[in-house]
Amino acid sequence: MLKDLFGKSRYVTVKREEHTSSKKKAPGDDRLWTKCKKCKEIIFNKKLVENLMVCPKCGYHFRLTARDRLAITIDEGSFKEFGQDIKTVDPLEFPGYQQKIGKYKVKTGMEEAIITGEATIEGYPVVIAVMDFHFMGGSMGSVVGEKVTRAIEKAISTRKPLVIFSTAGGARMQEGMLSLMQMAKTSAAIKRLNKAGILYVSVMTDPTSGGVTASFASLGDIIIAEKGALIAFAGPRVIKQTISTKLPEGFQRAEFLLDHGMVDMVLSRHEIRDELAKILKIHQIGVVSNGG
């Protein structure tokens, strides 16, 4: 049974569709306006999209799809996807799992909760992986773990810096221990990347939690958090119910983690691409000066 874990899909045959930011409707579908979840401001959708899905009044960052994230991060036309042939199977024959995967494939136009590929950012080559919370809450199952691992291995073999945008609700319960195993698997791969001397920049977006936080997302050489992102292992509601104590203001938000030394910087969505380019430029200068 396990030998077929990364085989061709035996159950779901929904054809993958190209899913770009230009084709995707703004939040609210056919509506012209969106209400900000934080300040309740009514925002014209066109204005919201032009502002990279950030509320112009309070700065609240709406969640992005993986392809929208790619579109605002990498150089246009530079993306070469790999790993799209890895299909989700149902190793535990969990009731309803095949149907749920099929539903999310149709809903998101994606095969899984992550996209991996090679691209450039301001001309600097990278291996990039972007998770998508819209696909089963960004949960990490065996395919997500395998694609992250292959992205790491691609970075090692090509000696290109690795950039991973994380957003996840935790391990995928429908795959049981096989999903939990991905924490150790991806962490071991990051260790090999580290030994090879390859730069790894981890970007945590809202929300990043569970097994993803406890593995590769927290192992970057440089860890960037998007402004206002929830970053946690167990969420604040679970912790509050467990210890019956009122939590500090902003607990587990990006800014709180920065104050406590858990991330290196907190950036708005508008700043991330430029900051990545600066990091890559400095890294390239360092490699050249060392004869790399």
Swiss-Prot record:
<comment type="similarity">
    <text>Belongs to the AccD/PCCB family.</text>
</comment>
<feature type="binding site">
    <location>
        <position position="36"/>
    </location>
    <ligand>
        <name>Zn(2+)</name>
    </ligand>
</feature>
<keyword id="KW-0863">Zinc-finger</keyword>
<dbReference type="GO" id="GO:2001295">
    <property type="term" value="P:malonyl-CoA biosynthetic process"/>
</dbReference>
<keyword id="KW-0963">Cytoplasm</keyword>
<dbReference type="InterPro" id="IPR041010">
    <property type="entry name" value="Znf-ACC"/>
</dbReference>
<keyword id="KW-0479">Metal-binding</keyword>
<keyword id="KW-0275">Fatty acid biosynthesis</keyword>
<dbReference type="GO" id="GO:0016743">
    <property type="term" value="F:carboxyl- or carbamoyltransferase activity"/>
</dbReference>
<dbReference type="GO" id="GO:0009317">
    <property type="term" value="C:acetyl-CoA carboxylase complex"/>
</dbReference>
<protein>
    <recommendedName>
        <fullName>Acetyl-coenzyme A carboxylase carboxyl transferase subunit beta</fullName>
        <ecNumber>2.1.3.15</ecNumber>
    </recommendedName>
</protein>
<keyword id="KW-0547">Nucleotide-binding</keyword>
<comment type="function">
    <text>Component of the acetyl coenzyme A carboxylase (ACC) complex. Biotin carboxylase (BC) catalyzes the carboxylation of biotin on its carrier protein (BCCP) and then the CO(2) group is transferred by the transcarboxylase to acetyl-CoA to form malonyl-CoA.</text>
</comment>
<comment type="subunit">
    <text>Acetyl-CoA carboxylase is a heterohexamer composed of biotin carboxyl carrier protein (AccB), biotin carboxylase (AccC) and two subunits each of ACCase subunit alpha (AccA) and ACCase subunit beta (AccD).</text>
</comment>
<dbReference type="InterPro" id="IPR000438">
    <property type="entry name" value="Acetyl_CoA_COase_Trfase_b_su"/>
</dbReference>
<feature type="binding site">
    <location>
        <position position="55"/>
    </location>
    <ligand>
        <name>Zn(2+)</name>
    </ligand>
</feature>
<feature type="binding site">
    <location>
        <position position="58"/>
    </location>
    <ligand>
        <name>Zn(2+)</name>
    </ligand>
</feature>
<dbReference type="GO" id="GO:0005524">
    <property type="term" value="F:ATP binding"/>
</dbReference>
<dbReference type="GO" id="GO:0006633">
    <property type="term" value="P:fatty acid biosynthetic process"/>
</dbReference>
<keyword id="KW-0444">Lipid biosynthesis</keyword>
<keyword id="KW-0276">Fatty acid metabolism</keyword>
<dbReference type="InterPro" id="IPR034733">
    <property type="entry name" value="AcCoA_carboxyl_beta"/>
</dbReference>
<dbReference type="GO" id="GO:0003989">
    <property type="term" value="F:acetyl-CoA carboxylase activity"/>
</dbReference>
<feature type="zinc finger region" description="C4-type">
    <location>
        <begin position="36"/>
        <end position="58"/>
    </location>
</feature>
<comment type="pathway">
    <text>Lipid metabolism; malonyl-CoA biosynthesis; malonyl-CoA from acetyl-CoA: step 1/1.</text>
</comment>
<feature type="domain" description="CoA carboxyltransferase N-terminal">
    <location>
        <begin position="32"/>
        <end position="292"/>
    </location>
</feature>
<feature type="binding site">
    <location>
        <position position="39"/>
    </location>
    <ligand>
        <name>Zn(2+)</name>
    </ligand>
</feature>
<dbReference type="InterPro" id="IPR011762">
    <property type="entry name" value="COA_CT_N"/>
</dbReference>
<keyword id="KW-0862">Zinc</keyword>
<keyword id="KW-0067">ATP-binding</keyword>
<dbReference type="GO" id="GO:0008270">
    <property type="term" value="F:zinc ion binding"/>
</dbReference>
<keyword id="KW-0808">Transferase</keyword>
<dbReference type="Pfam" id="PF17848">
    <property type="entry name" value="Zn_ribbon_ACC"/>
</dbReference>
<dbReference type="Pfam" id="PF01039">
    <property type="entry name" value="Carboxyl_trans"/>
</dbReference>
<keyword id="KW-0443">Lipid metabolism</keyword>
<dbReference type="InterPro" id="IPR029045">
    <property type="entry name" value="ClpP/crotonase-like_dom_sf"/>
</dbReference>
